[in-house]
Amino acid sequence: MSVVTATPPAGISNRNQPDSCNVLLSVRNVQKVYGAREAVTRALDDVSFDICEGEFVGVMGPSGSGKSTLLNCISTIDTVTSGNIILNGLDITQLRSRQLSKFRRDDLGFIFQDANLLDTLTGFENIALALTIKGEKANDVRAKVDRTADLLGVADVLQKYPRQMSGGQRQRVAAARAIVADPKLVLADEPTGALDSRNAAVLLETLEVLNEKLNATIMMVTHDAVAASYADRILFIKDGKLFNELRRGDADRTDFYQRILEIQAFLSGKQGASSAVGFVASHVSALRK
């Protein structure tokens, strides 16, 4: 496993990942290469890690580091050049086209930066779509949508169309759509990127609810340290490699946020204690807004 790690502070261990856990996602020696001969770009370079069932994992890194490529490979939007991605015992790199469609429908939930709701469907219909595609009975669909909407606080917008909702409401409806069919893994791609700080906080609290109350396994790509501080563990990617791993453990979210910023400062070239501390200090107020 090609990882350059920093030793975690003493006494820190991940909240949701004990020494022995049920590994849901296993990424093994994944490489993704674009181009050929002299014009080769190695977007992912021997990346390996595990995610446990019920874990909330963030993925961070500079622009062009490979984090979006990693998400695309796990979601089967893109294919790996070599290596294996195993979800719940199934090696998805070996699936054929028809099998991939079933895999995406049954095992994955998606939350995108722009919600991606269908404008001609109500909130209820957007959430129900995942269940309808699976052929579930109408009574079961209504019960599951209502239960999920109540949990995520969007019951009052079920009869509204996306254009009648706020940005935060649209993203929470998207989160409900992602989880209503009980997927094995929820993939979130910059889910707060199009939201103001207030609506971003509401969405992140929604993801926390999914993780803590439904034991949803979440993998979230983000550039935002505030968003990442809601996760149990952060994987940092640099130049296509898994550069570092940071666990929250028993730290509160503010402390975890500061540690994330320190690594971000290092990755961005702001090395040294004084610059890292200054970088942290300039951002701490974001958690208090």
Task: Please name every model-derived segment.
Residues 161-165, 169-171:
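Conserved ABC ATPase signature
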Residues 90-91, 128, 132, 139-156:
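Conserved ABC ATPase "signature" region
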Residues 83-91:
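Conserved ABC transporter NBD signature motif
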Residues 154, 158, 178-179:
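ABC ATPase C-loop
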Residues 186-189:
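Catalytic Walker B motif of ABC-type/P-loop ATPase nucleotide-binding domains
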Residues 121-129:
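Short coil-to-helix segment of the ABC ATPase nucleotide-binding domain corresponding to the Q-loop/switch region
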Residues 241-266:
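Conserved beta-strand-loop-alpha-helix hinge in the C-terminal portion
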Residues 105, 160-163, 180-181:
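Conserved signature/switch motifs of ABC ATPase nucleotide-binding domains
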